């Protein structure tokens, strides 16, 4: 056989192998095949706007994985001395594997309890968050059934380690480690964070800007403005705005010790929240009491 024919045959064989490879082709399903399927929405190839696609746990296992040792994850607070070997997929690898569209620069993790975590590109690059698939070599649900008292769900996001990359006044960046993740949505920072950006007339107020930066990192996880942000707290942005405007002293107490104001609150206490940070949050949220955004 001539060299040219050999090259053609070899190329054809490679193409056939690629076509039959479990990682080739679109990985998304049109319909749910199992309760453990992860929902995918937004700006990804093969996802029509407004629709939901699915990726199975088995399919996720075919993606490039990493195994890291995790300590200090608040989802496992009752195991403070135990190091966990977590196997999963880096979010940036997941984005490329699911073929996020070029305009997408934000990944949003939605959880069954209404919590949401937003991952802009700089966070993903600096902190390398991981979608966990296994703990100590076991599927998360299997490991939980054997060893753990608090269920993080089929999917959670964690880090090998976390060091804050910035601070706003006394507020330090905190890790985004959602549990019970049911959906990943690809979107844009401009659209999502734009919903809670300060009004143009307040854009030059440094106190409002500081409050926005803190709220964007922290409050947005459990409080929503329309379809953006989390719903876990049951208190939307406008409610916080009215609260900050009408009862600033109580609002500040809510920031430091939420259960003293709302016994049903699941928000963690922050008794060390500095006065400038608390005032910045007040100033920012007060703009939502009367100003349409």
Give the residues covered by each predicted segment:
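N-terminal intrinsically disordered, low-complexity segments enriched in P/E/S/T
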Residues: 21-210, 217, 228, 236, ...
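Solvent-exposed, polar/charged alpha-helical surfaces in well-ordered, non-transmembrane soluble domains
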Residues: 89-93, 209-220, 249, 253, ...
């Amino acid at each position: 056989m001539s060299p040219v024919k050999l090259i053609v045959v070899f190329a054809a064989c490679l193409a056939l192998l690629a076509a039959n490879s479990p990682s080739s082709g679109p990985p998304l399903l049109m319909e749910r095949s199992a309760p453990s399927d992860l929902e995918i929405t937004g700006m990804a190839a093969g996802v029509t706007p407004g629709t939901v696609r699915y990726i199975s746990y088995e399919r996720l296992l075919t993606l490039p994985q990493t195994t890291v040792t995790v300590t200090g994850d608040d989802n496992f607070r009752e195991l403070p001395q135990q190091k966990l070997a977590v196997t999963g997929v880096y979010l940036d690898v997941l984005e490329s594997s699911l073929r996020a569209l070029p305009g997408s620069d934000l990944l949003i993790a939605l959880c069954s309890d209404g919590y949401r975590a937003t991952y802009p590109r700089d966070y993903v690059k600096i902190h390398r968050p991981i979608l966990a698939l296994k703990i100590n070599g076991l599927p998360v649900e299997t490991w939980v059934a054997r060893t753990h008292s608090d269920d993080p769900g089929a999917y959670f996001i964690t880090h090998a380690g976390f060091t804050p990359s910035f601070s706003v006044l006394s507020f330090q960046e905190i890790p985004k480690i959602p549990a019970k993740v049911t959906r990943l949505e690809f979107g844009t920072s401009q659209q999502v964070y734009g919903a809670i950006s300060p009004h143009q007339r307040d854009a030059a107020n440094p106190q409002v800007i500081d409050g926005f930066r803190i709220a964007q990192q922290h409050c947005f996880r459990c409080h929503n403005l329309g379809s953006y942000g989390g719903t876990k707290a049951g208190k939307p942005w406008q409610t916080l705005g009215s609260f900050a405007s009408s009862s600033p002293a109580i609002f500040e107490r809510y920031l430091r010790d939420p259960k003293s104001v709302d016994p049903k609150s699941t928000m963690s206490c922050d008794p060390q929240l500095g006065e400038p940070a608390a005032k910045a949050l007040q100033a920012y949220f007060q703009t939502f009491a009367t100003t349409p955004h």
